[in-house]
C-alpha cells in the first residue's frame, strides 16, 4: 500500500473478527515500528504483546474495574471552543453508531475501551525513562504498519487509568510506566462500529505559511 494512502485510510477499529493474528505478522508490524524516531535515538520503548486467554482475562479485569469506577464518557470535560465543537460532533456520531448496536455511548466507547473491543491481541507499550512523548511516534508507526498489512487497531486511552493492573497481569516490571494500550486484530467488516471515520480539519485552518509566494 502506498504510504500516503495508508495515512489517509487508517481509522480506529472498534469491532474485530474472532480470528487469531499470527505472531509473525505482529513481528513484521513491530519490525517496522522500531524505525520510528526518538529523541537522541533513545528508543525508550518496551513492548508486551498478549493474546489468547491472557488477553481475554485482562479485558475481563479491566471492564470490571470500569463498571466499579464509572469513568465519564468522552466530551464531558472542558476544552477550547473549537476543540469542544469537534468533540461534540464526534460524540453525536458515536452515539448514533452505538444506538445501531443497541448500546449507550458509555457502553460502546468507555466500557468497550476497557474491554479492548474484544480484540484478539493487545499491545502495551511501556518505558521506565519518563520520556512518554517518544512513545507516540512508535505507536503511530505501528498503527500504520498494521493497516498496511490488513489489520485494524484502536489506540485506547481509558485503560491507562489501570496501569498498575496491566503491569500486574502482563508481568511488566514495576519501574515501567504503561504509556500506550492498543487493541489489534482483523476488522469486522459487517459491524456498524467500523463504518465511521472521523473528519479532519483542512490545513488552511491550522497552518501558517511564512516566506512562501
Predicted regions, residues:
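Acidic, surface-exposed loops and disordered segments
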Residues: 1-213
